[in-house]
UniProtKB/Swiss-Prot annotation:
Species in which this protein is naturally found: Thermodesulfovibrio yellowstonii (strain ATCC 51303 / DSM 11347 / YP87)
Protein name: tRNA (guanine-N(1)-)-methyltransferase
Molecular function per GO: tRNA (guanine(37)-N1)-methyltransferase activity
SUPFAM superfamilies for the chain: alpha/beta knot
This enzyme's EC code(s): 2.1.1.228
């Protein structure tokens, strides 16, 4: 799978791509990321990419010409592309969209803005706008890396163990279950006995139950289209939680 990133900070992108799961996937040829320095597509000796906004106002706006030149250049190879603008106005990125992108045959090209944004005429060059959340960042580089990382880890061979990505949070509609490793006990906190039992069926049920518990407590909005078995587990959890609340309410208070 091929990604492209248009940015004024190519070293920012390239540094991240050297490490971790994404770095290994690139070394194995599972994915490819081409980074383009927007300043290479300017026409003045100062390699200027921004200017004052028409109508006044604070900050600077990125000019359309460098983006236009860069996009025309990369399109000259004739490959099919989906050009994506990273923008707080875009569609919210999530795990479902990451999975959809893994099936995309086109090159995914990410446009990274800076300053107060990009000249509105950039919209005539893009296919889609994507946001990673309702907050303000200094530029589109972090969102581009978030999306690339999220997609790459879903590609066959990227994680080594194919079950790893299947069991990630959100892949089955829930948050993840708790994870433990050695030592069995740390400062009085023990690993749940069920995980040491070797009974894989019971462990799977425990993990499903704990994933539902975490989702119910932290992201109840994700609890949709539950199976009958999940509904049964959820009802048991609700009874358990309500019982705990009542017990806590009746505990004596020491003044």
């Amino acid at each position: 799978m091929i990604f492209e990133v248009l940015t004024i900070f190519p070293e920012f992108i390239e540094c991240y791509l050297k490490h971790g799961i994404v770095g290994r996937a690139l070394n194995r040829g599972i994915a490819q990321v081409k980074v383009y320095n927007l300043r290479d597509f300017t026409t003045d000796k100062h390699k200027k990419v921004d200017d004052y906004p028409y109508g006044g106002g604070a900050g600077m706006v990125m000019q359309i010409e460098p983006f236009s030149n860069a996009i025309k250049h990369i399109k000259s190879d004739g490959k099919k592309r989906k050009i994506i603008l990273l923008s707080p106005q875009g569609k919210r990125f999530n795990q479902k969209l990451a999975l959809e992108f893994t099936r995309e045959e086109a090159v995914l090209t990410f446009i990274c803005g800076r300053y107060e944004g990009i000249d509105e005429r950039i919209k005539s060059f893009i296919d889609e706008e994507i946001s990673i959340g309702d907050y303000v960042l200094s530029g589109g580089e972090l969102p581009a890396l978030v999306i690339i990382d999220s997609i790459v880890r879903l590609l066959p061979g990227a994680l080594g163990d194919e079950l790893s990505s299947e069991e990630d949070s959100f892949m089955k509609g829930f948050l993840d279950y708790p994870h433990y490793t050695r030592p069995e006990e740390f400062e009085g906190m023990r690993v749940p006995e069920i995980l040491l039992s070797g009974d894989h069926k019971k462990i799977a049920l425990w993990r499903r139950r704990e994933a539902l518990r975490t989702t119910f407590q932290k992201r109840p909005d994700l609890l949709k289209n539950l199976s009958q078995e999940d509904m049964k587990i959820l009802k048991e959890l609700c009874s358990e939680i309500n019982k705990k609340i009542l017990e806590d309410a009746h505990e004596p208070v020491n003044n």
